[in-house]
């Protein structure tokens, strides 16, 4: 069989993992590292552990919300904790989960020894993307007009997201305010 499925606490399972992999996917997983990695720097330690299981030229694929995503400024609740502005305010308490900005993620990657990575920008987010943008192909004015996709939580509307996205695009800031990221680490 080409697929092995492991269920349980990552630290317990990882001790028995001996294989190396071409690809490791962390889809909606990385943000929970402080819940299952016993370390003062759980996000760094988690990536270090995962990196040990990559084959030469292997890749890690991460999908994660951007804590500075425009949807949070516009009135969506933080996806995991269900509260307004939690990520924008820097997660004042450790609650077992944390998302990151692009710069914060890049800092973590470099501390772990990943210097080659590509960011992609799923729109409206990675869970149900309509389009995936890249640094080579960023959105154009008027393209980001499908912004009312907060399926599981109530939201308020604080401004017209399409107009604000257009302003962000004009100022070359879309990678900073994308609602989520799809990242390939090499």
Predicted features by range, described:
Residues 39-59:
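A short glycine-rich, Lys/Arg-flanked "PGG" loop and its adjoining helix->strand segment in the class I
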Residues 94-121:
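Short alpha-helix
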Residues 2-12:
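Conserved SAM-binding strand-loop segment of SAM-dependent methyltransferases
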């Amino acid at each position: 069989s080409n697929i092995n499925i492991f269920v349980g606490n990552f630290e317990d399972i990882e001790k028995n993992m001996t294989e190396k992999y071409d690809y490791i996917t962390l889809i909606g997983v990385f943000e929970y590292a402080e819940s299952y990695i016993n370390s003062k720097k759980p996000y760094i330690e988690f990536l270090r552990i995962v990196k040990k299981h990559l084959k030469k030229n292997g890749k890690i694929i991460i999908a994660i919300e951007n804590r500075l995503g425009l949807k949070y400024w516009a009135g969506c609740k933080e996806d995991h904790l269900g509260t307004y502005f939690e990520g924008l305010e820097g997660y004042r308490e450790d609650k077992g989960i944390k998302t990151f900005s692009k710069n914060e993620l890049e800092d973590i990657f470099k501390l772990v020894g990943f210097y080659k990575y590509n960011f992609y920008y799923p729109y409206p987010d990675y869970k149900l993307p309509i389009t995936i943008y890249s640094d080579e192909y960023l959105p154009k004015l008027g393209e980001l007009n499908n912004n009312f996709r907060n399926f599981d939580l109530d939201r308020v509307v604080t401004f017209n997201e399409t107009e604000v996205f257009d302003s962000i695009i004009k100022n070359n800031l879309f990678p900073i305010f994308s609602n989520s990221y799809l990242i390939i680490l090499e």
